[in-house]
């Protein structure tokens, strides 16, 4: 059995934002949706207007929406318990509104109008066992005392197991291992660095130079 270094909470999966058609009565809106695990809100804090702030989306048949969306759909900010219809791929499915979130500020790193259970995404069944799938970020909260390097080291065997074919192809094509002898490695990126990260030849790099350069030029212009 291969196991990771213990984490404070299990990994939280989150797709890139999708537009989802949400209907109630005669009202239809294309909303900015985020497909997340039901315990997503145990790591990220989104103030709740109505409902359980720790678990505003308690099961796979529930969704959480913002005050603004509730007002648009139902004519009131208290839409708790109402049934909405969501276009999930080619199917229309009913969901219960179990949480009303306060409107998310525009400058938030994570911004959406409706949160939907991750397992209901139209591609979930196709890719649930595809370990090389990279279409969504995965967030991990480490247990207190566990360092990033310790966690990454604990994932080496897991990476080898689930990426064997890819690694063999890399070796065949002449790829060189990193300083630790790894051809593929799971790496963690601190959330504070997410806006400074980019991939160069499939290697994650964090560069803060450009934003600070722009900021410096702005200050120079102001003082001139």
Q: Which residue ranges define each predicted feature?
A:
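Aromatic/His-enriched, Gly/Pro-containing loop or helix-boundary segments
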Residues: 59
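Short hydrophobic/aromatic segments of transmembrane alpha-helices and their interfaces
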Residues: 24-25, 53, 130-132, 215
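Short, solvent-exposed loop/turn elements at beta->coil junctions and helix N-caps
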Residues: 17-23, 53-55, 84-86
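Mid-to-C-terminal secondary-structure elements
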Residues: 34-49, 62-205
């Amino acid at each position: 059995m291969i196991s990771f270094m213990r984490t404070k909470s299990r990994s939280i999966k989150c797709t890139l934002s999708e537009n989802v058609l949400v209907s109630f009565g005669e009202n239809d809106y294309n909303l900015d949706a985020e497909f997340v695990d039901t315990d997503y809100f145990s790591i990220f804090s989104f103030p709740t207007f109505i409902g359980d702030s720790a678990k505003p989306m308690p099961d796979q048949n529930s969704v959480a929406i913002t005050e603004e969306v509730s007002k648009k759909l139902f004519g009131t900010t208290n839409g708790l318990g109402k049934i909405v219809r969501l276009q999930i791929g080619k199917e229309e499915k009913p969901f219960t509104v179990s949480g009303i979130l306060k409107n998310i500020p525009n400058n938030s790193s994570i911004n959406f109008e409706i949160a939907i259970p991750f397992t209901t995404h139209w591609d979930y069944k196709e890719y649930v066992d595809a370990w090389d799938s990279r279409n969504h970020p995965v967030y991990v909260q480490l247990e207190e005392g566990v360092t990033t390097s310790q966690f990454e080291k604990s994932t080496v065997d897991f990476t080898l197991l689930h990426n064997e074919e890819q690694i063999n192809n890399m070796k065949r094509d002449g790829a060189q291992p990193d300083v630790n002898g790894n051809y593929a490695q799971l790496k963690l990126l601190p959330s504070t660095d997410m806006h400074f990260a980019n991939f160069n030849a499939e290697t994650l790099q964090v560069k803060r130079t450009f934003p600070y350069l722009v900021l410096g030029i702005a200050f120079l212009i102001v003082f001139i």
